[in-house]
């Protein structure tokens, strides 16, 4: 493989995209319907709109997250809590603004948006970390080499 081969990068992009689309569809719908009080139709519209958005942001988010993980490793070593905190901070800081725009575009009112984004941020204390593990699982599944 040459120095400028795009193979590993494409594999990483596909793995990151698959992980984000699947994870956000399932978790997002649960949050929107069960916690935020959105109708099933509103949530389905939101989730369907989120697919192309997630396709666009998945790989940049994967690189953003990896930068948080590398920072945590540099400053706290391989500590379990540091990696989980990095996953949490990366997920909430990147995904919350994107999520708010998706909700706004499908007609969620201000109260629903605040409720959904705030609930997502709270739930992300667990789910952002869980997404990090799911992302790493998908990267292994797609045989991505050299990720954090």
From Swiss-Prot:
Organism encoding this protein: Yersinia pestis
Protein known as: L-alanine exporter AlaE
GO BP term (any one): amino acid export across plasma membrane
Subcellular location(s) per record: Cell inner membrane
A GO CC term assigned to this protein in UniProt: plasma membrane
Bilayer disposition of the protein: Multi-pass membrane protein
Keyword terms, alphabetized: Amino-acid transport, Cell inner membrane, Cell membrane, Membrane, Transmembrane, Transmembrane helix, Transport
UniProt-listed InterPro entries: Ala_export_AlaE
Family listed: Belongs to the AlaE exporter family.
């Amino acid at each position: 493989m040459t120095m400028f081969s795009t193979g590993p990068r494409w594999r990483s992009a596909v793995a990151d995209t698959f992980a984000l689309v699947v994870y956000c569809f399932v978790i997002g719908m649960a949050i929107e319907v069960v916690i935020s009080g959105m109708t099933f139709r509103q949530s389905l519209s939101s989730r369907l709109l989120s697919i192309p958005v997630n396709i666009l942001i998945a790989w940049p988010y994967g690189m953003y997250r990896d930068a948080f993980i590398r920072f945590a490793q540099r400053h706290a070593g391989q500590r379990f809590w540091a990696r989980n905190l990095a996953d949490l901070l990366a997920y909430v800081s990147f995904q919350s603004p994107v999520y708010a725009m998706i909700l706004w575009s499908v007609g969620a009112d201000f109260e629903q948006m605040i409720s959904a984004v705030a609930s997502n941020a709270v739930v992300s204390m667990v789910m952002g970390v869980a997404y990090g593990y799911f992302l790493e699982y998908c990267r292994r599944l797609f045989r991505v080499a050299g990720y954090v």
